[in-house]
């Protein structure tokens, strides 16, 4: 998509921090209420991976992609843990690990793409370290 490079998109121009931890709690409470109203007993909530956030919000603050990715992962950890604490399965959407190959990294060698993907997975694993594996699933597209 050649037009994509000319779009003005939001980006990171300062330290990343959670501004409203209550928002994720409220979302989980709303989903629980909706499930109860319809007799559902199991549910999941989805959240973006740190890697995909880094693709859509350009870094203008951190000294490297790695530092930026780690800051995103730490901020997303709060949301991930809120979802798990509420009893839901957390579905992490990770297009950066699949679709990113032919879109964002099409000019990169396969080895470079794999190196980047390994970093994204490392950050994701760190961000989800307090969540039981049975409460996690990954969506690739």
What are these regions (language model features)?
Residues 1-141:
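Domain-level signal for soluble alpha/beta catalytic cores
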């Amino acid at each position: 998509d050649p037009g994509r490079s000319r779009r003005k998109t939001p980006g990171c121009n300062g330290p990343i921090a959670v501004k409203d931890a209550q928002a994720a709690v409220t979302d989980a409470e709303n989903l629980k209420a909706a499930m109860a109203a319809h007799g559902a007993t199991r549910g999941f909530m989805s959240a973006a991976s740190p890697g995909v956030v880094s693709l859509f919000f350009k870094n203008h603050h951190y000294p490297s992609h790695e530092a930026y990715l780690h800051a995103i992962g730490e901020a997303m950890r709060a949301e991930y843990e809120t979802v798990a604490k509420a009893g839901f399965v957390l579905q992490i959407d990770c297009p950066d690990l699949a679709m990113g190959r032919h879109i964002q990294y099409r000019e990169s060698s396969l080895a470079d793409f794999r190196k980047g993907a390994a970093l994204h997975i490392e950050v994701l694993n760190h961000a989800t370290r307090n969540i039981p594996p049975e409460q996690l699933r990954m969506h690739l597209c």
